[in-house]
Amino acid sequence: MEQTNDIYNRIIYENEAKGQQYRLTVNEFREQMYLHIRKYYLSFDEGYLPTKEGACIPMTIGSVAELFDALVDLLSETE
């Protein structure tokens, strides 16, 4: 398993046939917490590595609350 400096790291989608993962991660940079949703690819020699595809937002109570509300809305629409 690869070593990261992530405070939180969770696979939220995986396609083993294509060697792809999407991960939700949280890390700190210059004393600011960031939340990432990023695509990873399977390297032949180093395990899964991040791509440039994804999004990163400052992790604040407000941004996490908005993300949570959006996910709740999506879930309620699928029922």
Regions found by a protein language model. Name each.
Residues E53-E79:
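Mixed-charge, Lys/Arg-enriched low-complexity segments
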Residues N5-D6, R23, E31, I61, ...:
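Low-complexity, intrinsically disordered regions enriched in charged/polar residues
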Residues Y22-E53:
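A short, structured beta-strand/loop element
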Residues Y13-E14, V26-E31, M59:
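Generic structural "secondary-structure junction" signal
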Residues I7, I11-I12, I37, I57, ...:
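Weak global preference for isoleucine
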Residues M1-Q20:
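Negatively charged, low-complexity tracts enriched in Asp/Glu with abundant Ser/Thr
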